[in-house]
Amino acid sequence: MASPTKGGDLFSSDEEGPAVLAGPGPGPGGAEGSAEERRVKVSSLPFSVEALMSDKKPPKESPAVPPDCASAGAVLRPLLLPGHGVRDAHSPGPLVKPFETASVKSENSEDGAPWIQEPGRYSPPPRHMSPTTCTLRKHKTNRKPRTPFTTSQLLALERKFRQKQYLSIAERAEFSSSLNLTETQVKIWFQNRRAKAKRLQEAELEKLKMAAKPMLPSGFSLPFPINSPLQAASIYGASYPFHRPVLPIPPVGLYATPVGYGMYHLS
């Protein structure tokens, strides 16, 4: 057998290809000659130092495909190529699918919400857009038109009202005939005038109350009852038999603490 030191001679580089021994060497024994004859072609594997040091790599051979698999691949290739070719060529297939799904979703949403289309009790009332108009107070249809009094009639009515606020039937008939008015017109005018006078009187009383309110502090009350002898003496003066002089209360005493016990007397 050949020694392992001769491996470099047996293998050739990638460019030379596989090396084959030419013939039987002049070996001493017949066994070595027969072994060398039976040697087969050795594949070129870069196991030498020079091959390992260099960056050259052997070309990778494509694996052999069995004939059965090759025939099956040839049959399947025409079936797969049209689909892949269309997909690689930017086919509108993936673009059409979102529209189809969107249309299906919209149809499903319409089918899933029938209460929106059906005018049932859950449907919102339709809104009628109308121009914004100022809504005025509607008067009664059978309301009589307002009487346009003249200046002389108004002056005569005011003078009569100051003399007498309530007129009898005879006085009202005579007064209405003198002013060329009906009794109903005079009657209604006096009613409205009395209501106006009442409102004015209430407003005057309210003004007087507001004017007199700051004079006394809030929550202030007299430290003694109204029906006490001291209060009666101050009211009636010397005519009261048990008259006692009333001492004047200083202004500071109004806000002092001893007066506070009568705060809730009149409340």
UniProtKB/Swiss-Prot annotation:
Summarize tissue expression. Answer: Expressed in mesenchymal tissue in the developing spinal cord and limbs.
Gene label: Msx2
What ranges are recorded for DNA binding?
142-201
Question: Cross-referenced InterPro entries, in alphabetical order?
Answer: HD (IPR001356), HD_metazoa (IPR020479), Homeobox_CS (IPR017970), Homeodomain-like_sf (IPR009057), Msh_Homeobox_Regulators (IPR050674)
Q: Which GO terms describe its biological process?
A: activation of meiosis; anterior/posterior pattern specification; BMP signaling pathway; bone morphogenesis; bone trabecula formation; branching involved in mammary gland duct morphogenesis; cartilage development; cell surface receptor signaling pathway involved in heart development
Q: Where in the cell is it found?
A: Nucleus
Report the protein's function. Acts as a transcriptional regulator in bone development. Represses the ALPL promoter activity and antagonizes the stimulatory effect of DLX5 on ALPL expression during osteoblast differentiation. Probable morphogenetic role. May play a role in limb-pattern formation. In osteoblasts, suppresses transcription driven by the osteocalcin FGF response element (OCFRE). Binds to the homeodomain-response element of the ALPL promoter.
- Assembly with partners or alone: Interacts with MINT. Interacts with XRCC6 (Ku70) and XRCC5 (Ku80).
Q: Would you identify the family this protein belongs to, as annotated?
A: Belongs to the Msh homeobox family.
One function term, GO molecular function aspect: RNA polymerase II transcription regulatory region sequence-specific DNA binding
Please tell me the species this chain comes from: Mus musculus (Mouse)
Does the record bear Plastid in its keywords? no
Which one Pfam family would you cite for this protein? Answer: Homeodomain
Key words of the record: Developmental protein, DNA-binding, Homeobox, Nucleus, Osteogenesis, Repressor, Transcription, Transcription regulation
| A Gene Ontology cellular-component term | transcription regulator complex
- UniProt-annotated stretches for the region Disordered: 1-42, 104-132
For this entry, the protein name equals Homeobox protein MSX-2
Summarize induction of expression. Up-regulated by BMP2.
Name the source's superkingdom: Eukaryota
